[in-house]
Amino acid sequence: MKTSFSSFTVHTIEGYISSIYLVEYDDGMLLMDSGCVNDVKRIEDYCKQVVNRPLGDIKLIVVSHMHPDHAGGANALRSKYGIAVAAHKDVDLWYSGLGGLLQHKLDCYMAMGVAQKNKRKREHMLFYPIIHPDFLLDDLQALPFFEDWAALHTPGHTMHDIVLYHQKESLLYIADMICDVKGKMLLPLPVLAPPQIENSYDKLASLNSSTLLMAHGGVKQMEDTSALFLSMKEQLKRPPNPIMRKVYRLSTFTPEIKRQGM
């Protein structure tokens, strides 16, 4: 699937767990997240068979956060094709130390559970948990090679979440900030920092973008995205259900929880 804008085309690659977005310009391509480690082959096949361009034309991979279906393929794509990787400046703290090692294993375990629930065949999921970004991103920073895009720091799902904003096209790649589950717009799993994610939703609502690229939900063109983000804040007030509680309990071993004073 592809969606055309005035200066680029957005291709949707259906990954093992999440949608991966490839932004095609005449002079290069931008990959929004790298999917799972087993999605490298899917990205390769899409570029060769659909876009008809070599993977070396991808100038930058932006990793929105460290979960397996977003960061899993980054190291492999950089090693194989020399593609630069950008991510939040503190992203490698997420899986650092013994707690981070345990968190990495648990996140891969939970990701496999999601794939199984989606009736996917079992595939390799483990990936090296440190990405050493070539470019460290901070809030409101323009992307290297693609200065028409800005990175926005939107913590709450993890501490290092970033979304990508294209002001001219009123377009947002929101990664996991909202998940479309059977037509219902829901909070991500987990929400590790409710106050921070509430502030993040306020930030995103203020942009009133007309198009959302969702890692779990596809491309959404809407008249009022502000209302959608504000409705997520209302969901934060509801008591967590058993699944939310379980995922939260399995997601608190990263040393970033203590470092952030949570």
Briefly describe each language-model feature range.
Residues 1, 122-149:
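Short, conserved active-site entrance elements at the starts or edges of catalytic domains
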Residues 1-50, 163-177:
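Conserved beta-strand hairpin/beta-sheet module of binuclear metal-dependent hydrolase folds
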Residues 242-262:
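C-terminal regulatory/interaction regions
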Residues 38-40, 48-135, 234-239:
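Active-site HxH/HxHxD metal-binding segment of metal-dependent hydrolases
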Residues 30-32, 62, 85, 171-173, ...:
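Residue-level marker for buried hydrophobic side chains located in beta-strands
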Residues 7-12, 61-64, 149-153, 188-192:
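Short, flexible loop segments at the rims of nucleotide/cofactor-binding pockets, characterized by
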Residues 36-38, 127, 150-231, 235-236:
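Metallo-beta-lactamase
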Residues 57-59, 72-78, 141, 152, ...:
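Soluble, non-transmembrane catalytic domains of enzymes that act on hydrophobic metabolites at membranes
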